[in-house]
C-alpha cells in the first residue's frame, strides 16, 4: 500500500525514521512537498484558529496535498516526547502544537472522512528505540495485522537509519563551521 507522510513539524525532523520504517514494511512512501505559500493556501479553510503558529497552520495544506493525490493512508502520530539529545537536559518534551497537532487535523479536516482516508495518529513516545518499537508493534498489529516481529525489525532498521542521518547532519555542520572559520565568512 501507500502511506502519506506530511512534511511538517517533527515529522520533518524524524522523516528518515518513518521513511525507513514504512519501506521495510512494504509501503510506498509519499512525502508532501516543501512548504510554500501554495501549500499554506491549500489548507487555509480548515485552520480553526488564527492563534496557531505558522508551522502548525502549514500542516493543513500538507494533509490536503496528500488527500488530493488520493493517498489512502496518512500517518501523523502525536509525539509528546523526543529522544533526550543532551545529557543533563531538563526535559525532552515537544511543544503542545507538535505533541498533538494531528488531533487538530483529524477533528477539523472533513476531507479525511469525505475521501475515506485512513488517518492514523496514535500517541507515541520517541524516547527510545525500545519504547517506540513496542508502541509501533501494538499499533500495526491492531491496524494492519502485521506480525510484531516484522514491525520490530522495521523499527530497528528505522532507528539505525535515523541515527546515521543525524550523524551525517552533525558531520556536515562541523564541516560548514570549519569552512566559515577558515574563510572568515559568517553563517547563521
Segments from the language model and where they lie:
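An N-terminal assembly and electron-transfer interface module characteristic of large anaerobic redox
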Residues: 1-187
Amino acid at each position: 500500500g501507500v502511506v502519506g507522510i506530511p512534511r511538517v513539524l517533527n515529522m520533518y525532523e524524524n522523516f528518515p525514521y518513518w521513511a525507513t520504517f514504512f519501506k521495510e514494511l512494504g509501503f510506498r512512501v509519499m512525502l508532501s512537498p516543501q512548504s510554500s505559500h501554495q501549500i499554506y493556501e491549500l489548507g487555509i479553510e480548515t485552520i480553526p484558529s488564527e492563534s496557531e503558529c505558522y508551522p502548525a497552520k502549514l500542516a493543513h495544506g500538507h494533509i490536503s496535498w496528500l488527500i488530493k493525490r488520493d493517498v489512502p493512508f496518512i500517518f501523523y502520530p502525536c509525539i509528546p516526547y523526543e529522544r533526550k539529545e543532551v545529557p543533563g537536559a531538563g526535559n525532552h518534551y515537544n511543544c503542545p502544537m507538535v505533541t498533538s497537532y494531528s488531533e487538530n487535523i483529524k477533528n477539523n479536516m472533513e476531507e479525511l472522512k469525505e475521501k475515506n482516508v485512513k488517518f492514523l495518529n496514535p500517541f507515541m513516545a520517541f524516547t527510545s528505540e525500545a519504547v517506540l518499537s513496542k508502541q509501533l508493534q501494538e499499533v500495526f498489529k491492531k491496524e494492519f495485522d502485521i506480525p510484531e516481529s516484522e514491525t520490530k525489525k522495521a523499527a530497528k532498521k528505522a532507528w539505525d537509519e535515523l541515527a546515521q542521518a543525524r550523524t551525517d547532519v552533525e558531520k556536515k555542520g562541523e564541516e560548514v563551521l570549519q569552512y566559515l572559520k577558515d574563510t572568515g565568512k559568517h553563517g547563521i
